[in-house]
Amino acid sequence: MTTSNVELIPIYTDWANRHLSKGSLSKSIRDISNDFRDYRLVSQLINVIVPINEFSPAFTKRLAKITSNLDGLETCLDYLKNLGLDCSKLTKTDIDSGNLGAVLQLLFLLSTYKQKLRQLKKDQKKLEQLPTSIMPPAVSKLPSPRVATSATASATNPNSNFPQMSTSRLQTPQSRISKIDSSKIGIKPKTSGLKPPSSSTTSSNNTNSFRPSSRSSGNNNVGSTISTSAKSLESSSTYSSISNLNRPTSQLQKPSRPQTQLVRVATTTKIGSSKLAAPKAVSTPKLASVKTIGAKQEPDNSGGGGGGMLKLKLFSSKNPSSSSNSPQPTRKAAAVPQQQTLSKIAAPVKSGLKPPTSKLGSATSMSKLCTPKVSYRKTDAPIISQQDSKRCSKSSEEESGYAGFNSTSPTSSSTEGSLSMHSTSSKSSTSDEKSPSSDDLTLNASIVTAIRQPIAATPVSPNIINKPVEEKPTLAVKGVKSTAKKDPPPAVPPRDTQPTIGVVSPIMAHKKLTNDPVISEKPEPEKLQSMSIDTTDVPPLPPLKSVVPLKMTSIRQPPTYDVLLKQGKITSPVKSFGYEQSSASEDSIVAHASAQVTPPTKTSGNHSLERRMGKNKTSESSGYTSDAGVAMCAKMREKLKEYDDMTRRAQNGYPDNFEDSSSLSSGISDNNELDDISTDDLSGVDMATVASKHSDYSHFVRHPTSSSSKPRVPSRSSTSVDSRSRAEQENVYKLLSQCRTSQRGAAATSTFGQHSLRSPGYSSYSPHLSVSADKDTMSMHSQTSRRPSSQKPSYSGQFHSLDRKCHLQEFTSTEHRMAALLSPRRVPNSMSKYDSSAAALNASGMSRSMILLESLSPRPPRRHQSPADSCIITASPSAPRRSHSPRGPTARIPLSLASSPVHVNNNWGSYSARSRGGSSTGIYGETFQLHRLSDEKSPAHSAKSEMGSQLSLASTTAYGSLNEKYEHAIRDMARDLECYKNTVDSLTKKQENYGALFDLFEQKLRKLTQHIDRSNLKPEEAIRFRQDIAHLRDISNHLASNSAHANEGAGELLRQPSLESVASHRSSMSSSSKSSKQEKISLSSFGKNKKSWIRSSLSKFTKKKNKNYDEAHMPSISGSQGTLDNIDVIELKQELKERDSALYEVRLDNLDRAREVDVLRETVNKLKTENKQLKKEVDKLTNGPATRASSRASIPVIYDDEHVYDAACSSTSASQSSKRSSGCNSIKVTVNVDIAGEISSIVNPDKEIIVGYLAMPTSQSCWKDIDVSILGLFEVYLSRIDVEHQLGIDARDSILGYQIGELRRVIGDSTTMITSHPTDILTSSTTIRMFMHGAAQSRVDSLVLDMLLPKQMILQLVKSILTERRLVLAGATGIGKSKLAKTLAAYVSIRTNQSEDSIVNISIPENNKEELLQVERRLEKILRSKESCIVILDNIPKNRIAFVVSVFANVPLQNNEGPFVVCTVNRYQIPELQIHHNFKMSVMSNRLEGFILRYLRRRAVEDEYRLTVQMPSELFKIIDFFPIALQAVNNFIEKTNSVDVTVGPRACLNCPLTVDGSREWFIRLWNENFIPYLERVARDGKKTFGRCTSFEDPTDIVSEKWPWFDGENPENVLKRLQLQDLVPSPANSSRQHFNPLESLIQLHATKHQTIDNI
């Protein structure tokens, strides 16, 4: 493997995957040398690459008949040879063997063939294009821009238009061009007549195409993206962006040899139905720039890395005949520096359009649009004839970006064709149009340009427009321009040829202002109309130094605004003050619609009102400004400068840097030219409006840039300024007195003022001053921005008065205010009928209080509003800005009542302090209006008012009279008093209810006392009653004293401060009863309440009685008891008993609930502990390898306070099972113990054993890793069930293979390798079934795992039966002889190729002679036949062994013929069968080398996996205990009797695998089975063998090894042997004489006797 091949592997793999994905292959290839060995994959790739031809049917037929892989590869190579490919160096054997060089050579041939096909297709389509067709009309409605272009030619290369086909891109990887299927893209051309471009992969520099640039980084100094979007075909919004350079503009000069030629750019029409999507046009708020590259000659790079990049340059020319080889200097054209701008635009390779149906006027062709490679390169483009280069733009604004929107321009006179394109804005680029490929589509696919004719390749300098054009702060749109003129043919209709390429640059930096007039055209917010380019009559436009962006007028703006602009009566704001405009929305677009701008006058250093108004217009794109209002603002512009000066003078006179309101009023009084406005007739609303507006404007003076909230440090004023300030302060006081008498301001409300209410969520930045249409009302309202911008609100005037923090304000909710929040148009004009406007004048220099204004005349209250809530208060800007509140303000008590009681609500004060639910923003909470007044001037005031009391001023100005002031306070107090009365009444009713209950009970006690008094009781009964009464008295006294302490601070009345003044004597006495009622709520006092209530009542009764007489003076009770009525006493006692019983039951229930809560809490803790342990196990599994230790070593330590079921999984498999049950992904792995040794799809649950769970494979996993994991899992399983390793099974050698669904895998066999990736096949529901070696492989691995017997033992038995043909299995009862015999018979039948019917089971009857004769005949017949069958004689009775011997004696012995015979007997003393009839005897021990342990462990592991329950560690100790107990039993049997009667392991195989269940089961087994059987065996042994020696009780051994720690001791639950009568005493044994002859005769008599087994 060479280095070059290694480098080419990923390239070829990617190439093959890309083409195979077009076919039916759903998964990608990973290893080409291995995957392409399959002829099916090779043929599929060939079918994708090679189109259908005359050899295809034969190739398909041959593939259908292929039977081997080599034949398929040979068929594929023959097919390629027929196609003309050189396959001489390729052989099928090399490909089949996975030779990398051969596979790479094959792929190289296919890629080369693919390139040839593309080249032929491209050349064919070039020939099909007609050069005389006429371009169909374009659908673009965008203005015709001009594009400053440059070009270089390549005349030195005569074959530049027919490039050579490059070699395969796989060998030298290039930037691939994705082939875009037009059917997938969804282009549905309607009237288009253009042929779609061919998909070219050549690397010629002479093939023309658009090439995109990389994305702009947003830096102003980096070239921005020139992009167009396919979605823009149906859009009429902004364009894709070309940003101008953020540097000083230079004057454009004519070059020495301006020799350029126009490139005809053809475009498709009706692209509106195209489904092509394009990248989003990024709208950036910053300046972007266009990187331009001077036109230089670029060498041919056809063989280079960028060979696949097709290039195109757009350029213009004056003289097409002349040429120059020298590069041209870089210059700026139009709005950007006149350089040879490279429009790096990408588009898909195919546009999917149909061939043209009409003739073109000149030679045009479709360009190859390629995928961009992120690099900047200069492009070469050939030049076409001179007649195609004559194109210019007739635009009214010198290459302005959106000049002429919605305006009709002359039709284009270009006859050859047009390039029309809709582009998309950044807002519409994220539409629902689907993009077929984000890699290939970076340009509108409708722009397809090509140049067919080979032209002289001489560098030509661009046509430089000799116009000094400065940098435009516009969205620049450039068009193609040429000064050459050509008359249009008469057949061309208007608007059919519109070479429009819309490119938008979000240039928002208003760097330069121009003094040249700019003609403004009125834009309309409708669908944009097309702007045609006329090439015939284009007069030279005057040079422009700068284009000033005008504000976008609103849709609601009447046309008179444009008239005013043209007449020069008003001046539009030309600059954003204090910040740089950072939006590229419709504001900038409309601004470019004007061609002239009147320069504004220079603003003052302190930011006059004119500048602030200009800022207002900049901040808002579509305000509700009327024409008359704008005219009035313009008229007032110069006059308000003087007010600004007064503002500064007033500001210097106050230490808090706040202006006094009187300065503005004085200024207004001194200027009578302002529409005859005077301050004498100013109403309260109007004067407050003027003062507030003055203060607000002073706020803008302090913060000219809106970027800092620090107030300016005031300078010390002179004496003249101080005196003037004091005089102005006096004017304020007198103006306020006039405001109280004027009602004019409350009567008029401007319609325009309604628009001051904005929708919630917008911030107010500056005031807006406008005059209504009738020029009678001037309105000031908040100026809110319709969209978010970078402006920050300036917070000023945050200087609070001393008592302002405690002031509040309430707002009323009216339908007018709510309507204003939704839309300003919903505010009715008749609101003045319901409200009389009032304003608050709060001079910022007043640092002690708040000035409130209120009109005197009575006003009709609003609906849903109390008469008291009638004052509208407006704050000065000194208060912090708040959001607008939907409620109106509510008037409160003036400041002079500040000493009212504490409980009265203090809701007066400043506007900012009174805003409880949020106030309006600054001074714009209400609409401010200035009305036209008379010429009366305000009188002068004395300077002494400065030292007057501001509190008195507030008290005199807040209300019209003292009567109204006190009436308002009385109304508030009356309302509060009414609330208190309601509270007192409700509490009194409650106390009366309690008193009624108390009276009722007292009546019952009184009645009881009367009965006692009237009754004549016996002395002893009277004494008993007296004792009871005394006892009740003591209890009641004690309870009363306790309740007195408990009632302190309790109850609602005790918390009321006015309890004594409103509560009655009865309510105060019944407070104890109220507290007793509260005690009834608690559970602990349930049942005691009634009793304590009764006892307190009895105590009070006895106290009243004791005041009059004591017990000695009580009348004696004598006489009969027949008149006593005990009903009431009995009822009371019964009620007490019921209460006590109910309390007792509740307490019991409470205890039960507490107990349940404790149980649940313990359960939760257990679950938490288990969850933590499971998480730890999961972490171990995910972090570490899947390994498993033995069962004993892996089970964690369980502490004493934990239960066994809280333990986590003890091994990996158990953890995985728990993880699977909890929803985690894992794969179940089973092993099949079928002795056949074949991988079968038949699932037998009895033969399936779960060995564990496998973790989900990863993307890096392969099938070898799966093999290793499965074998490791099986090895761990064997280590768990066979701890001693007695089975002798090798986990890695005993597994044949595994099956996954229909897929089979034989381990070690490469032919059965699964081609699919493991992650594609293995899921959480998949089961991997392993199969072990068996009879088919002449091995016994599956038989050993099924029987759990040692492998050597099984091999010996199989060898015996195959060689001897007759086998006897002898052993004790319960060892498993019958199952082993049947399994061996089945194994032999498979091993000898016999069917299952060949196994014959013969049961020998014990007593029935007729059946015995039938069995004898049948058995003899089978033995005499020569057919190979297997006979099973299971469990031969003890008295029929002679019968079996006689049957075999009658049949002669045949060595290699006859049936196989397997017999099972309970004893092995059968020498006749072994000696005379060639039987192989196999004696099975009762221990079976740990059979019990292996069987029970396998059961435990099986339950662990199936039930997903972890086995406790104590269970494995219990499993180890069973062989010890069984061995103790068998040792006792062997001592007292013979081995024949020992107990096999079957008795312990059915043990429950739980700790408690196994304990109870073993106790029952020992007491009910083992002890009786041992006693019987011992007695039979004494009779048979005379064994009466001493013995050891096995119960002692069992008690010593007892594994259960819970429960009683084993000595207490286990029975012991009762064999005292069998043990001889020492005295008797000494007297008895042993007779050996008698003993020998007895043994001989019972030699062949057997004892029945239990």
Swiss-Prot record:
Name of the encoding gene: unc-53
Coiled coil: 962-994, 1152-1184
Protein name per Swiss-Prot or TrEMBL: Adapter protein unc-53
UniProt-recorded Gene Ontology molecular function terms: actin filament binding; calmodulin binding
InterPro entries for this protein: CH_dom (IPR001715), CH_dom_sf (IPR036872), Nav/unc-53 (IPR039041), P-loop_NTPase (IPR027417)
Record keyword Membrane present: no
Family, similarity comment: Belongs to the Nav/unc-53 family.
Calponin-homology (CH) domain boundaries: 6-115
CDD domains: CH_NAV2-like (cd21212)
Keywords linked to the UniProt accession: Calmodulin-binding, Coiled coil, Developmental protein
SUPFAM superfamilies listed in its UniProt record: Calponin-homology domain, CH-domain, P-loop containing nucleoside triphosphate hydrolases
Xref: PANTHER family: PROTEIN SICKIE (PTHR12784:SF28), STEERIN (PTHR12784)
Gene Ontology, cellular component aspect: cytoplasm
Pfam families per the UniProt record, alphabetical: AAA_lid_NAV1, Ubiquitin_6
Bias type Basic and acidic residues, positions: 388-397
Function, as annotated: Involved in the migration and outgrowth of muscles, axons and excretory canals.
Subunit structure: Interacts with sem-5. Interacts with cmd-1 in the presence of Ca(2+).
